[in-house]
């Protein structure tokens, strides 16, 4: 029966989406990955999320860019301090550094025109029905309840000076009986959740005159009373009901309730990186998962939506496509944010055109063809090729620290586009070496920090290295881009398990393995090392493969150098998987030497 169910799931993967919903009787907290929570991830953690266009990733945290680092193209905007800025990005960058200054409106500033949000009919200043005064409107207006969600409520509370966001969007407010409110004249609002002011959200007015109900909010304060045993502790100190964690909604206000998930509640979408996002963000034209799968296979999804006449609702479900006439009252600043994002520099990479620890060694692999692994290089020391390496762009090669010594850099050559030692091909290029950088904390006894950089010499009169037939592999910035059981590829000229020499470049597929302490107790360091192999040991790296690549492809077939062949024992034995240097742990170290623009993508 279990086998039949497994076959059914494999034939119809859509059935497996039910994993996002907790099974009956399953404890709600089981959806939260406790080990991940210890890292205190928030919406500013670039291991889990993309930074905004006015931010950059520094040591795992989205930090403020300086305004001059923003793209120059754009329309002027006005801030709450009455000062104009050349673009939305310039203002958001300034706000990032000075949070008290917020967006007011598009265009130039005028003394009398200011956006305003307020609450009325509440018992305290933390709650009430929401009113807004748009810049070009004469009167304050209410917001329609049917366009109001936790997303918009969070932004309203941020705007009102409550940094922990919303506590509830339901409330009993004290509307005097003699106050007649016309709920047919309310405004509709749509936010994305990245805004800090409601002024950045899009306001519209519908032609319908039916009553809508009015949006209200109760903002969160530190004295909110949530039972500790039945609540989720957000990184910012806020507490929310446990059942609201991993539901695709940013209830914490800092997104910490959605970044450490093993599954998602309701219709939320689970990224491979353990992040839950609202279902309506799937196939919306913008990548939200750092692993990219929310924008994969979207053509079929769009066809189905059009065929069914459905659109995504604010709550992540589906609703009929609206035909009601809508008047847009404010510019769509989210479209402007996406436009700014599109202007950021693009990176082209990853797409083809002796002790008891033995230095590692591809066993059981297949011969490679020209162009299969254009990032693979060989490092020649004197008259013999001793190690592999990975081209990562510019003049830089990534390899293992145990392969090279800084003092011997003049002895090394980098061979690119090499397929066979014995039959040099016409595409083969030989580069001299100008510098070797070994990680300062490399430990030759334990193989910790077994990583090094080799800088190739530039040809006379050239500003850059020109490797015509080479393509750089992308450098991963997050440890969550790939997961245990993902299938990846190793390549090299290492010996076979019978110690027979190999002269042609060979490759093989291996699976990433989780914590390998059970195979190498006391010698495996999870943060710095990655295990990979096959269940029968038929594919492995072997002596001579050291320094070479363990590469993995994402859903868009972009190749990342996930590991560097480092060490292991007993070539080709299933109980002794290969151990690789985990490259994602060294992104900042690599970028320090090679320059961030060479390896940075997605605004990292």
UniProtKB/Swiss-Prot annotation:
Class of this enzyme: hydrolase
One biological process term in Gene Ontology: innate immune response
InterPro entries: CFAI_FIMAC_N, CFAI_KAZAL, FacI_MAC, Kazal_dom, Kazal_dom_sf, LDL_receptor-like_sf, LDLR_class-A_CS, LDrepeatLR_classA_rpt
Binding-site list for Ca(2+) 2: 284, 286, 288, 294-295
Residue ranges of every copy of the SRCR domain listed in the record: 117-217
Keyword presence, Hydrolase: yes
Protein's name in the database: Complement factor I
Lineage of the organism: Eukaryota, Metazoa, Chordata, Craniata, Vertebrata
Gene: Cfi
């Amino acid at each position: 029966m279990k086998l039949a169910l497994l076959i059914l799931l494999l034939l119809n993967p859509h059935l497996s989406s039910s994993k996002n919903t907790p099974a009956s009787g399953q404890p709600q907290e089981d959806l939260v990955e406790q080990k991940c929570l210890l890292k205190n991830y928030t919406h500013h953690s670039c291991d889990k999320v993309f930074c905004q266009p006015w931010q950059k990733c520094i040591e795992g945290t989205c930090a403020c860019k300086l305004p001059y680092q923003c793209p120059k193209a754009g329309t002027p905007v006005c801030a709450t301090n009455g000062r104009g800025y050349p673009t939305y990005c310039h203002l958001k960058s300034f706000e990032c550094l000075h949070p008290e200054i917020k967006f007011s409106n598009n265009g130039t500033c005028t003394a009398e025109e200011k956006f305003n949000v307020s609450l009325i009919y509440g018992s305290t200043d933390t709650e009430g029905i929401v009113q807004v005064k748009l810049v070009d409107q004469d009167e304050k207006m209410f917001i329609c309840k049917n366009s109001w969600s936790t997303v918009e409520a969070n932004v309203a509370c941020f705007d009102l000076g409550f940094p922990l966001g919303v506590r509830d969007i339901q409330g009993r407010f004290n509307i005097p009986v003699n106050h007649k409110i016309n709920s047919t004249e309310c405004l509709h609002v749509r936010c994305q959740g990245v805004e800090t002011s409601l002024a950045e959200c899009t306001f519209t007015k519908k032609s319908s005159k039916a009553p809508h109900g009015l949006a209200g909010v109760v903002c969160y304060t530190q004295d909110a009373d949530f039972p500790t045993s039945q609540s989720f502790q957000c990184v910012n100190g806020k507490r929310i009901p446990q059942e609201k964690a991993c539901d695709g909604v940013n209830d914490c206000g800092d997104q910490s309730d959605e970044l450490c998930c093993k599954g998602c509640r309701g219709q939320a979408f689970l990224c491979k990186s353990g992040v839950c996002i609202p279902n309506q963000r799937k196939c919306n034209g913008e990548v939200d998962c750092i692993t990219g799968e929310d924008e994969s296979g979207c053509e079929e999804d769009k066809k189905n939506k059009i065929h069914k006449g459905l659109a995504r609702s604010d709550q992540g479900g589906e609703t009929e496509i609206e035909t009601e006439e809508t008047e847009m009252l404010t510019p769509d600043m989210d479209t402007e944010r996406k436009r700014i994002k599109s202007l950021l520099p693009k990176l082209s990479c990853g797409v083809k055109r002796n002790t008891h620890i033995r230095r590692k060694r591809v066993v059981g692999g297949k011969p490679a063809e020209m162009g299969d692994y254009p990032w693979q290089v060989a490092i020649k020391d004197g008259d013999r090729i001793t190690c592999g390496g990975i081209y990562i762009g510019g003049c830089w090669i990534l390899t293992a620290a145990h392969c090279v010594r800084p003092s011997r850099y003049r002895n090394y050559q980098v061979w690119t586009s090499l397929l066979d030692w014995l039959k040099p091909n016409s595409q083969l290029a030989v580069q001299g070496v100008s510098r070797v950088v070994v990680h300062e904390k490399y430990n030759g006894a334990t193989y910790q920090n077994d990583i090094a950089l080799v800088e190739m010499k530039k040809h006379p009169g050239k500003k850059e290295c020109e490797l015509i037939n080479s393509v750089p592999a992308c450098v991963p910035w997050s440890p969550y881009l790939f997961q245990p059981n993902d299938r990846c590829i190793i390549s090299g000229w290492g010996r076979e398990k019978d110690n027979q020499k190999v002269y042609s470049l060979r490759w093989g597929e291996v699976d990433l393995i989780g914590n390998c302490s059970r195979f190498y107790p006391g010698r495996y360091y999870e943060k710095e090392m990655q295990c990979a192999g096959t269940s029968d040991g038929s594919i492995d790296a072997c002596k001579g493969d050291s320094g070479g690549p363990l590469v993995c492809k994402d859903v868009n077939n972009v190749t990342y150098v996930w590991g560097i062949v480092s060490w292991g024992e007993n070539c080709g034995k299933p109980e002794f998987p290969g151990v690789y240097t985990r490259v994602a742990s060294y992104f900042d170290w690599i970028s320090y030497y090679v320059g961030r623009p060479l390896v940075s993508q997605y605004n990292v």
